[in-house]
Amino acid sequence: DGRPRTSPRGGSASGKRFQKEPQHNAASHSTYNQEEGYVRIYLRGRPVTNYLPSDVEDYDINAKHPAPTEKLKLDWVYGYRGRDCRCNLYLLPTGEIVYFMAAVVILYNVEEQNQRHYMGHNDDVKSIAVHPDSVTIATGQVAGHDAAEGKPHVRIWSSITLETLHVIGLGFFDRAVCSLSFSKVNVGVNLAAVDESNEHVLSLWDWKKEKKICDTKSSQDPVLACEFHPMNDEQIITLGKGHIHFWNTAGGKLVKKSGIFEKYDKPKFMLSLAFTGNGDVITGDSNGNMYIWGKGNTRISQAVLGAHEGGIFSLCVMNDGQILSGGGKDKKVVLWTADYQQSETTQVPEATGPVRTLCKGKGENFYVGTTRNAILSGDMGGDFTTLVQAHTEELWGLALHPTQGMFLTCGYDKNVILWDFEQHTQRWNKFMEDGCQSAGFHPSGEVVAIGMTSGRWVALDVESGDLYTVHTDGKEQHDIIRYSPNGEYLAVASHDNYIYIYSVKETGRKYSKVGRCSGHSSFVTHIDWSADSTKLQSNSGDYELLFWDAETCKQIVGSKETRDIEWATFTGVLGYPVCGIWPEGSDGTDVNTTARSGNGNILATGDDFGKISLFRYPVNHPKADCNSFKGHSSHVTSVAFNEDSTKLISTGGRDMSCMQWSVV
């Protein structure tokens, strides 16, 4: 897909449960055996046999399978990308704050509690700039999955209509666009961009004409910021690892002068910059020093040494000329007078992490984006409100409450979060001892089970998040954890190829082991319970579809016994009702997750390319048509419908995001 993706668990897997092998076309080899009553598809060369229910008559394998009428509309994005991006939080005159997560740019009106979304990108957004008109916005993205459209580029769009106005740089940028800035004086006709190629190429564009004016190699080292001077359109400043460069753009060329540190310590990283009202440049660095570079000068005219303990990740000049600085290590926000005297100090909360970026709000208020993917609003009084907070590492665990408007997510960051559908807020957030992989609510809605990456699993009280019980099965992650519909059994499907079965008493407060289902030759990827709570079906990493008796933990073989089982849920990727979900050229690992809607009309799937697709259920013809929706940038790890099938929640793996959609 154009860029190496490294697994968070080491190795260069695609950051997910499955290793990629040579591709094999799933759909084109499908066959139908009328006598035996099965459809056979091939995944990576392996036959997968799907038995038809006995009441299916006149089955035609070549019949068209139309897409459903239902579509998805994005309602809410949980999360903000502060962990590895910077300068990515702005306040618009509409009262909306604008920032990004995954492939979505979010315009969030805090007062009215609503979000709008710019959906033009097809992979991770890495950079953003707001035009001097405060309406036009430029956003830059990484190299994507799609060979044709997936090249890194910049999209320029209206924050009022959300229409795309211009697309620039397709085929020019390398890897990703990491920094953007509009010119300020000449009504913002120019746009500067830095990419993540080895040379970190700086380019200058006439964005309305979609024309490049000039470009140059800026630095072998990472570039962390790029800004036009607000009083001089012929000057651009870039800074990063071990450097600050002052660029002159006169005559359509980019000419570089490096900043000279003279008697001052040259820091390992220049981290942040801002401009004062008189045109001086202020920089913050990894040593915690603030340097002031006189207007039009490449030498330090003044220094504030030890302004922070550790790096200064952000600088922001307020409307009255005072300066805010935000610290990484010390988590402090410091207010400085216009002549660099320390005026006030406050600290952001420990739980939300260090300052990544600062943005001025109304009056004396300001917004803080943090390295733990949170956004806060507050003032120097230290009274901070958390507006956005979600996960900070890869995310797989998702469960929807059976009766109330709540859902739960859990991830490798060890956080378990219970969310409110309507309010888009956290009911509680519990920090566990191990990374979390999976979750499932007891049908009573009073208890939720969490599967860990360590082989442990726990049961928590839904109301309070308090721990009821801890169990250990094997030493590997528990990929799925699911209660039977009657609440009397719990199945724990593990990466060690086993499914552990427990009997459940006292609505999920007491557990005793029944046994384990042994028979898979690879790790278990999906499980579903039968409607009568007596049987299970399971998928594995090498495309086995097996059936089990819950009471005895014995495998059920023979198509007659299994073809007519009614399943309480359908979340697997193998079987007759889903044999058409595999796209042309699929290798069997592309689809990570499925969910049948409560009304049984549609099936949602989440794939490796950030797409959520809706199919008409059952998806019983190869190459079925579907409606697909983008928003996630990494593999979609989980999808789930609420009880009345009006909403869908999706989680992205490495994009760390969680999205709430309306089914329309």
UniProtKB/Swiss-Prot annotation:
Family that this chain belongs to: Belongs to the WD repeat EMAP family.
Record region (Disordered): 1-31
A GO-annotated cellular component: cytoplasm
GO biological process: microtubule cytoskeleton organization
Name listed for the protein in its UniProt record: 77 kDa echinoderm microtubule-associated protein
Any Pfam family: HELP
Record organism: Lytechinus variegatus (Green sea urchin)
WD repeat coordinates: 120-167, 172-215, 218-257, 265-303, 307-346, 390-429, 473-512, 519-558, 631-663
SMART domains from the UniProt entry: WD40
Role, per record: May modify the assembly dynamics of microtubules, such that microtubules are slightly longer, but more dynamic.
Chief place of localization: cytoplasm
